[in-house]
Amino acid sequence: KADAISKYDGQLTFSYNADSGAKPLYDAVVNQLKNNLGIDAATNPIPTFQEFRDAVTNRQMKGAFRTGWQPDYPSAENYLWQLYSTAAADGNGSNDGDYKSPAFDDLCKQAAAASSTDDANKLYQQAEEILLNDLPAIPLYYSNASGVASLNVKSGYAFDWQNRSEE
């Protein structure tokens, strides 16, 4: 189906910073694409996070590359606007793929001006539908924090909305 939409010739590369410990993950992605879909894929490890970010910031990446985001506050806006708005593209923010959609931007602006959180979230969900159709990024994995609990433990750790521990 993908070839019917847009034929792709050549090798698909996945760049990541080699000092992250993510090699097994990207090797697995490449092997899945090769073995299951017959896509010529390869990893492109970049030695350090600094070199990796410099290449992303300077728009020197070829092919797919890893990104990540940790929200500053618990709101859809902190993900959507920061990562996909036109205002955050072209080196002006964290829209590293330089995605641009006036319809997406308009919905996010309406959501930011909404009079209630529920109204804002409905608009953000509509904006997410645009992202789902345009697919400017493909989530490959999500990092989680793990914890255990027991009635026999009197104090311990709790995790906040950013998966950071609180004592």
Regions found by a protein language model. Give the residues of each.
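Solvent-exposed, polar/charged alpha-helical surfaces in well-ordered, non-transmembrane soluble domains
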Residues: 24-31, 35, 50, 54, ...
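Periplasmic binding protein-like
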Residues: 34-88
